[in-house]
Amino acid sequence: MEPLASNIQVLLQAAEFLERREREAEHGYASLCPHRSPGPIHRRKKRPPQAPGAQDSGRSVHNELEKRRRAQLKRCLERLKQQMPLGADCARYTTLSLLRRARMHIQKLEDQEQRARQLKERLRSKQQSLQRQLEQLRGLAGAAERERLRADSLDSSGLSSERSDSDQEELEVDVESLVFGGEAELLRGFVAGQEHSYSHGGGAWL
């Protein structure tokens, strides 16, 4: 952006110089030599007179250089018009007004770029803050998950212990019922045998 701004400044100075020269030429007081401050008059060496052909050649070279410079300035201005939002009436702009608008446009772009950098920096800081919060939440979630797994493990161990105690009690009850049931069966058999023997003995006595 800075090289473009410096180029615009150079073009602006050139356009101001050209317009000043054109106004001076229109009013008839254009001065080809720079203004000299009053001071002591120095003797000037007389230059030898030049031939008319040499003067014409120097003038033609100067005109050719001026023509090339104007053509280059025109090409730069055309490229500048393509890069600026001028609208439909861009043909009405003079060189000086076009360069001034270009300078204002560059300043506007620089301001936008600065605001964009500031916004980018704020967004980067916000992203870092959110990243830290996310890491903290992940740590809390991991701790909660480990606590839940530990609680589930303790619950499952408690249930296994209770189930083992219950199974042991049921086994003892089954054994006791089996023993008591066998003893009752033997007792009933013994009583039945006694009654049978008594019945046979009574018949013999009769």
From Swiss-Prot:
Disulphide bonds in the chain: none
A GO molecular-function annotation: protein dimerization activity
Matches recorded under InterPro entries: bHLH_dom (IPR011598), HLH_DNA-bd_sf (IPR036638)
GO biological process: regulation of transcription by RNA polymerase II
Key words, A-Z: DNA-binding, Nucleus, Repressor, Transcription, Transcription regulation
Residue ranges, annotated region (Disordered): 25-67, 146-171
Domain bHLH: 57-109
Function: Transcriptional repressor. Binds with MAX to form a sequence-specific DNA-binding protein complex which recognizes the core sequence 5'-CAC[GA]TG-3'. Antagonizes MYC transcriptional activity by competing for MAX and suppresses MYC dependent cell transformation.
Binding partners and assembly: Efficient DNA binding requires dimerization with another bHLH protein. Binds DNA as a heterodimer with MAX. Interacts with SIN3A AND SIN3B. Interacts with RNF17.
Protein name per its UniProtKB record: Max dimerization protein 3
Organism: Homo sapiens (Human)
